[in-house]
Regions:
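Acidic, proline/glycine-rich intrinsically disordered inter-domain spacer in sigma factors
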Residues: 1-21
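DNA-recognition helix of helix-turn-helix
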Residues: 42, 46-73
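A short pre-motif secondary-structure segment
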Residues: 30-34
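The N-cap/first-turn positions of alpha helices
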Residues: 26-27
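Flexible coil/turn residues that form the inter-helical turn or adjacent wing/linker of helix-turn-helix
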Residues: 37-38
Length: 74
């Protein structure tokens, strides 16, 4: 990755980080556990006392919310 790409990547990371602070729970926690913690949906579901499917749905909703906000803020 060249210097320009690294800067773009860093800017994107900062935008996502700011957006995470605007997400409600459990979206923020599930998204963070999945992306940064690299936990499986099964493990995330167990942490919350929910199903694997619940964790998957919440994660994908969180991603959609982040994507929508990124488009709004662009």
């Amino acid at each position: 990755m060249g210097p320009e790409e690294a800067i773009v990547h860093q800017d994107e990371s900062m935008r996502i980080h700011r957006l995470l602070h605007h997400l409600d729970e459990p979206y923020r926690e599930v998204f963070t556990l999945r992306t940064l913690g690299q936990l499986s949906f099964r493990d995330i579901g167990e942490l919350f006392g929910k199903s694997e499917n619940w964790a998957c749905v919440v994660y994908h909703r969180a991603r959609a919310k982040i994507k929508d906000k990124m488009e709004e803020w662009s």
